């Protein structure tokens, strides 16, 4: 999303969100690609709750603290934050970032677009939130759910 404001004078953050349960190569590619959008800006990972994973998959593989430890150890990640995700969106993570930063670059992976990103309707006209689609590639060649399905067979 473009704006009349100069992106280069703003205090920016790159926000990626997800369950990362378990983390896999697609996640690494996603975070690496997000960092490349603006190497001088911090990458914040909004980490979904255990409750969100239970709603999505029926259970979680790794609990929040363990997932946070793994994601925090990635070289392109500057900070990992919990956020309220009861509504299935990352609106709370975006709002938290907007309290600190002038501009949030909200990255979405290959399986997301403006028609299936719950945050889009709320922020599509907000010059402080820029959406980036297909970060890390436009295919979802791997998913945590598929990895776990293969494991449990």
What are these regions (language model features)?
Residues 2-153:
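Nucleotidyltransferase catalytic core that binds NTPs
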């Amino acid at each position: 999303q473009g704006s009349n404001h100069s992106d280069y004078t703003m205090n920016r953050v790159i926000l990626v969100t997800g369950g990362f349960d378990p983390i896999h190569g697609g996640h690494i590619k996603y975070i690496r690609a997000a960092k490349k959008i603006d190497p001088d800006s911090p990458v914040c990972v909004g980490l979904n709750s255990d409750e969100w994973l239970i709603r999505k998959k029926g259970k979680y593989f790794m609990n929040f603290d363990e997932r946070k430890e793994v994601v925090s150890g990635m070289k392109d990640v500057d900070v990992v934050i919990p956020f309220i995700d009861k509504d299935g969106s990352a609106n709370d993570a975006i709002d938290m970032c907007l309290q600190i930063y002038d501009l949030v670059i909200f990255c979405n992976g290959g399986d997301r677009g403006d028609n299936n990103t719950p945050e889009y309707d709320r922020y599509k006209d907000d010059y402080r939130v820029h959406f980036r689609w297909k970060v890390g590639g436009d295919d979802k060649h791997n998913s945590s759910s598929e990895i776990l399905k293969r494991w449990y067979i």
